């Protein structure tokens, strides 16, 4: 069975940034407020399914979305500009590939790949003289997991997630370099009530926040960082 999908996406963005410290070089002391803006894009996708074996493969494309942000800048050592030029921003296009298939009775294997074109995202307020606040590598994420229905009431899943790292020298505004994660979750149903809980452990890749300038060097050393997240949801059907 083959199906297609499409739709309009609305995206709202606002931001504020303050740069302080030697890692920013001459830009230390700079600050900017970006007022909210709503932009519109689209998504297109297609899916192929074989329900008898719980097979589903889907590909979805998300378009770029353009924004124009009213901007107030200040520093270093200067008064705020109440009516600075607007800052253009384009958020990245992306592609998702998702799949699942039955491998045994009440057991699924699932996974996905996501790519986002973050290397094309540039935020260039006027006072920075054409320099971008962002310098992000393209984003690649791989997910692979197994889900199983243990009874009519309880099902569970475990999955691994990998995000590719890039250059060890990273922006101080995003001081990670790839990551690896493990997620375990389960769902328990009681008549019309569905209880879902999960826990995630993520290990971040080592990175070196860099100084500003034409020849950046490491200004710090971030190693052995991790995070734990816990989620819980209650659903009621009627």
Language-model features, listed with the residues they occupy:
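Outer-membrane beta-barrel porins/channels
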Residues: 1-238
């Amino acid at each position: 069975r083959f199906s297609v999908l499409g739709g309009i996406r609305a995206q709202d963005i606002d931001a504020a940034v303050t740069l302080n410290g030697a890692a920013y070089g001459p830009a230390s002391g700079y600050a900017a407020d970006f007022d909210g803006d709503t932009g519109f894009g689209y998504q297109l996708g297609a899916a192929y399914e074989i329900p008898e074996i719980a097979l589903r493969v889907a590909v979805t494309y998300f378009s770029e979305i353009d924004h124009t942000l009213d901007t107030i800048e200040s520093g270093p050592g200067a008064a705020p500009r109440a009516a600075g030029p607007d800052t253009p921003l384009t958020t990245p296009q992306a592609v998702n590939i998702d799949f699942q298939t039955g491998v045994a009775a009440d057991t699924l294997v699932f996974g996905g790949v996501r790519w986002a074109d973050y290397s094309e995202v540039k935020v260039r307020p006027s006072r920075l003289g054409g320099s971008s606040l962002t310098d992000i590598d393209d984003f690649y994420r791989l997910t692979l997991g197994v889900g199983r229905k243990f009874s009519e009431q309880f099902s569970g899943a475990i999955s691994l997630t990998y995000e590719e790292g890039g250059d060890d020298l990273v922006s101080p505004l995003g001081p990670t370099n790839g990551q690896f994660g493990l997620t375990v979750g389960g769902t328990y149903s009681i008549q019309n009530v569905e209880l879902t809980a999960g826990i995630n452990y993520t290990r971040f890749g080592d990175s070196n926040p860099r100084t500003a300038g034409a020849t950046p060097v490491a200004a710090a050393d971030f190693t052995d960082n991790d995070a734990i997240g816990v989620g819980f949801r209650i659903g009621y059907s009627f």
